[in-house]
Curated annotation (Swiss-Prot):
Keywords: DNA damage, DNA repair
Protein's UniProt name: DNA mismatch repair protein MutL
Functional note: This protein is involved in the repair of mismatches in DNA. It is required for dam-dependent methyl-directed DNA mismatch repair. May act as a 'molecular matchmaker', a protein that promotes the formation of a stable complex between two or more DNA-binding proteins in an ATP-dependent manner without itself being part of a final effector complex.
Organism: Symbiobacterium thermophilum (strain DSM 24528 / JCM 14929 / IAM 14863 / T)
Domain of life of the native organism: Bacteria
Recorded name of the encoding gene: mutL
GO molecular function, one term: ATP hydrolysis activity
Annotated SUPFAM superfamilies: ATPase domain of HSP90 chaperone/DNA topoisomerase II/histidine kinase, DNA mismatch repair protein MutL, Ribosomal protein S5 domain 2-like
BP GO annotations: mismatch repair
Length: 635
């Protein structure tokens, strides 16, 4: 058996680096946190090659004398705590004394520093954790740390790094969180020769949000400030209209430390429980302030998670803070609050006049008006009116039976009595029977009309068929868009006026990595300075109403995408984008359809390779069999 022996310092530092330095973003986080602890007011971060080739952090903080600079490269050397009791009330971002020696152990490392009261600075060069040169050096007050060739001596770690764009996105996300947590500090982030973002450093959180997340998002945030016995919660929560497809826009800070906290996340999402559909997540920038001794920040190697002593009360504070903000903001469009606190509803005379003129589906527009996707003309099966058809131009009274209100009430009573008849249990309905190919079966269907302007009822060989018009159109659009993207032949609709879209630094880096997927899917876009994207064209048929949300949702999905080695990433992402675009472009429930529209929809669905489901796996067609109908009618 091998004898137990002490590891040499160099090996021990490389092992420690495995815990502290996971990727270039970890280096940036540790160095910027050191700068913040040094009371810096200006921080410049420069990277190259996604952080592999270069990471440089320059600050105007208090700097270090030569003795402290040398000591900083020793493990567990720190100015931030003295005893174990200090761990119970940590007020600094760093405290373990592991960051600099761990980073130096796996890189070509340079430290240049000067206190404000010293005339000369000091420079230390290290390679693989060993100091190779040091001495006086002319420099401005503050500290500059340069890290080159990260993991040059640990090639196994290099294999697990992602593309430069992905690593840059991770760095951008870390810096976004640190800059939001410290709006009084001016941050500048540069990748190569391009400036990614710059914050003003005025202490105004709204200005920092606008610089980092975009002006449009800053306009849609609601202020939050709530306090209970355990915590104070302040910052912003987003209106439900800007909810995202993932949680990448949830920023939580505990005592100014950017953290992941499941307790706060659950509390926030519970506050939005009845305001957002499944799969949509609220936006927030929330600062949680608790007594330092009531939160443990030493429970994770990277200090990314915390544990609250009064977890239940903190969750309650987050929940109440969000609920109060949402309650104070009138989420119903068109209402206003007068000076004396009275809620005023605007005059509906104009809407009544519009109703007399006839209803126009959302997005359809009127003759001569621009807009997005044109909705089909209104059509529905009706018992009244010539030919069983009622046009949208008829006044409201045309929908009442002859005899006025009394007849309407009698008709309502008859409908309620009819509702007592046992309904068909759709759980007992089946998908398309497999006695024939789905396409052939759909071609054999005879459309009867719309049900609730959402489903198409058809007579078919096995019984009554119901087709979800949205799911069916989704499948059609998906297969066309996906096939065209594979062949790089997607038809593009050029926009008369380009759309501008503000992205986060992480989203912009992800877009740059996946620009080819967007291009082959029909999106013509280019960077427009900073983190702004200029969109010149979209896939034909998509329209412009949902382009911004579609692009942001897809980028959010990619940001959270964990891809195993060897996975055909491009094709999978192409499918995801096609499915998301199809969902946005497809006709919706409650869209009225003309008979010719229904016939075209069925014909196109029958031609699909997989007409049974939409691209998300929901059925497009179900069948209520003849035997089930006979059973329900007691035949």
């Amino acid at each position: 058996m091998a004898r137990i022996r002490l590891l040499d310092e160099r090996t021990a530092n490389q092992i420690a680096a495995g815990e502290v330095v996971e990727r270039p973003a970890s280096v940036v986080k540790e160095l910027v946190e050191n700068a913040l602890d040094a009371q810096a007011k200006r921080i410049v971060v420069e990277v190259s090659g996604g952080g592999r080739e270069l990471v440089r952090v320059t600050d105007d903080g208090i700097g270090m004398v030569p003795e402290d600079a040398r000591l900083a490269l020793q493990r567990h050397a720190t100015s931030k705590i003295r005893t174990a009791e200090d761990l119970n009330a940590i007020t600094t971002l760093g405290f373990r004394g592991e960051a600099l020696p761990s980073i130096a152990a796996v890189s070509q490392f340079e430290l240049i520093t000067r206190p404000h009261d010293q005339l000369a600075g000091y420079r230390i060069l290290a390679e693989g954790g060993q100091i190779v040169a040091e001495g006086e050096h002319g420099c401005p007050a503050g500290t500059r740390v340069t890290v080159r060739d990260l993991f040059f001596n640990v090639p196994a770690r290099l294999k697990y790094l992602k593309t430069n764009a992905t690593e840059l996105a991770q760095i951008g996300d870390i810096l976004t969180r640190l800059a939001l947590a410290n709006p009084e500090v001016a941050f500048r982030f540069q990748s190569g020769q391009a400036q990614v973002f710059a914050t003003p450093g005025t202490g105004d959180l709204t200005a920092a949000v606008a610089a980092l997340l975009g002006r449009e998002m800053a306009k849609e945030l609601l202020p939050v400030d709530y306090r209970n016995d355990a915590a104070r919660v302040h910052g912003f929560v987003g209106r439900p209209t800007i909810a995202r497809a993932g949680r990448s826009h949830q920023y939580f800070f505990v005592n100014r430390r950017a953290v992941r906290t499941i307790a706060a996340r659950y509390a926030l999402e519970e506050a939005y429980a009845h305001l957002l559909p499944n799969g949509r997540y609220p936006v927030c920038i929330l600062f949680i302030e608790v007594e330092p001794h009531e939160v443990d920040v030493n429970v994770h190697p990277t200090k990314a998670e915390v544990r609250f002593q009064r977890d239940r009360e903190v969750r309650a504070a987050v929940y109440q803070a969000a609920r109060h903000a949402l309650g104070a903001a009138l989420l119903i469009p068109g209402t206003e609050v007068t000076a004396d606190g009275e809620v005023r509803v605007p005059d509906r005379a104009e809407e009544k006049a519009a109703l007399q003129r006839g209803w126009v589906p959302p997005g359809a527009g009127r003759p001569g008006e621009g807009g997005g996707r044109a909705a089909p003309p209104p059509w529905r099966v009706s018992a009244g009116g010539p030919g069983g058809q009622t046009t949208a131009r008829e006044p409201v009274q045309a929908y009442l039976p002859a005899g006025g209100l009394q007849a309407a009430l009698a008709q309502r009573a008859a409908e309620e009595a009819a509702a007592a008849v046992p309904a068909v249990d759709l759980a007992e309905a089946t998908l398309v029977p497999r006695s024939a190919e789905p396409g052939e079966l759909i071609r054999a269907l005879r459309p009867l009309g719309q049900v609730h302007r959402s489903y198409i009822a058809c007579d078919g060989p096995e019984g009554l068929y119901l087709i979800d018009q949205h799911a069916a159109h989704e499948r059609i659009f998906f297969e066309r868009l996906y096939a065209a993207a594979q062949e790089q032949a997607t038809a593009v609709q050029r926009l008369l006026f380009p759309l501008t879209l503000d992205l986060t630094p992480a989203q912009m880096a992800i877009w740059q990595e996946n620009a080819a997927i967007f291009a082959e899917s029909g999106f013509e876009a280019e960077p427009f300075g900073g983190n702004t994207l200029l969109i010149h064209g979209v896939p034909a048929g998509l329209g412009t109403d949902h382009v911004a949300r579609l692009v942001c949702d897809f980028l959010d999905r990619l940001q959270e995408d964990q891809v195993a080695p060897g996975t055909p990433v491009t094709d999978r992402r192409r499918r995801v984008l096609a499915a998301m675009a199809a969902c946005k472009a497809a006709i919706k429930a409650r869209d009225p359809l003309q008979p010719e529209d229904i016939a075209a929809l069925l014909s196109d669905l029958a031609a699909c390779a997989s007409p049974e489901t939409c691209p998300h796996g929901r059925p497009t067609v179900i069948c209520v069999s003849i035997s089930e109908l006979e059973k329900r009618f007691k035949r």
